[in-house]
Structures are given as C-alpha cells and as structure tokens.
Amino acid sequence: MLSTGALRAHLLAAGLAGTVATPREESLRSYRLFAARDPRVLLGLDPTGGWGEADLLRLMADKCGVSDDPAHRSGLDVIDPERTLRGLDAFAARVGAAAARRVPVLLGTGHPHRLLGFYVALADALSAAGCLVLTPAQGRCVDITTRFGVRTYVVDYVRGVALVREPGPSGDGREPGAHSHSPLPVRAALESAAEAGGPLPELVIGDHGWVCGAGQLGIEAIGLADTDDPALFVGEAEGQVSVAVPVDDGVRPAFYRPLTRYVLNRACLSR
C-alpha cells in the first residue's frame, strides 16, 4: 500500500506537484482567454459566473496553490501537493462509489500520450468490479477546430478508454492517439449512446473536454487538470464537475502509476 507520505514525496520528485513544468505565462494566458470566453479554453463548459481574470487567479490559487499575485508573470507554476492529495482522495471516493453501485461509466482522455495508462487501469478495475465500461461512437468522425484549422478525427477506444485519432489505419494498435481539448468527442459518444437506446454513463472520468463536456450536460464527471486548465476548476466551483484534481498532466506516463495505485487502493479496488 502506498502511503500518503510516500505519494506526496513522489508528486514532488516527479514534478506532478510542487514546481511543475507549466510556464506561468501559459497559465495566465489561459485565464485571460477563459475570461474572454474563448471556446478553446472553455472545454465545453458554459460558466454561469462572471469569472474575470482576477477571479480566475484567486480560484486557481485556492484550487491548485498557484501564486495569487497578479504581478508574478514569469517562471514555472506551482501546485500544492496537499491539494493534489485531497483531490485524489475525492476522486477515489467517486470511483469507489461508482464501483459499489456498478453503474455504467465512460472514460476518455485528450492526453493519451501521457495519461492513457492511468485511465486504462481505472477502466480495468471498474470492469472487474461489475461496472459496464461504455464504448459508444467508436469509429465516428468528429470535426475539431485546431490551431491548424478544422481537422477530422475518429473516436476510438483503447482497452475501454476513449480518445481521438487522425483518420487512417492505426497500425498495430500502439499508436497513442491525438492530443485534444475539445468537448465534441464526448458529445458524440453520449449522442451515440442515446441513439442506441442507452445506457448512458452515470460517471465520466477523464480530462479536458471529456470532463467539462459531460459535466455541462448534467452527467457526473471527475478528472485531472493542470494549472492552465481553469475550466475544470470553474466547473467544480459551479457544480458541473464533481472533482478536479490539480496535477501536472504532461510528465512521463510511468510517473502516474503511483497515483493509479493510490486511487485504486482508496477506492477499495486494488487487486
């Protein structure tokens, strides 16, 4: 069993919390774009509050532990490991409750290069506990606006975890998929599930648009978020997102394995 102290030490050593790799300038830019209601950073959320830049900086200081000083505009951002641990505990409680009730779940990631293994382990554990891990809209095309213009992607699943790929053959199946912030894939998945007569997920687990897109539609959603992803924390503050865990979402995949073990243990799903 991984102790809280051991996980805290790992979070700091791996750069998952403490001083993280996200530049302060990038976080502040995201807050500025969110305040302007730029859909690229809303991630499918339709916030009800005003949420100006100063409001967002205060919120992110409270939720993540970043500096609340608006004059601090350069360097690397900081995540308080205690907030990460509290978030993981709340995240694990939701996963455990879903497993206990054996509800249908949907898992999806916009960070397949880094986080796919984390979600695959959760999908395996939830399936073993009797949850139906949904895979709707597999093979469906979704047009997503990127910085390069509108690109067509395909919804795909790897061991129960949704992601998007560029069209074409996926080779031997080891291709990790594309990075995406868009809520369109989760909307496509939910629409496909509804068209097929259900069931719909009672819990969505993921990041980026998978969480905010589902939460905005009234489905319980939990996920991981970096300091430049204010939408998940706004969603948590407003009630559309159940749990947003502050953590660097861009470190090596192996560094998330202790988080997986911790969550599964706390959720009573360790095998």
Regions found by a protein language model. Name each.
Residues 199, 214-271:
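C-terminal functional extensions of proteins
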Residues 103, 131-132, 219:
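Short phosphate-binding/catalytic loops that engage adenosine nucleotides
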Residues 118-185:
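Long, charge-dense
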Residues 182, 186-227:
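A cross-taxonomic marker for long C-terminal extensions/tails that follow the last structured domain
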Residues 99, 127, 215:
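Anion (oxyanion) recognition and catalysis
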Residues 108-120, 207-212, 228-229:
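Gly/Ser/Thr-rich loops at beta-strand to alpha-helix junctions
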Residues 1-101, 105-110:
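Metallocofactor- and cofactor-centric catalytic cores in central/energy metabolism, strongly enriched
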Residues 91-95, 186-193, 259:
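Generic hydrophobic alpha-helical segments
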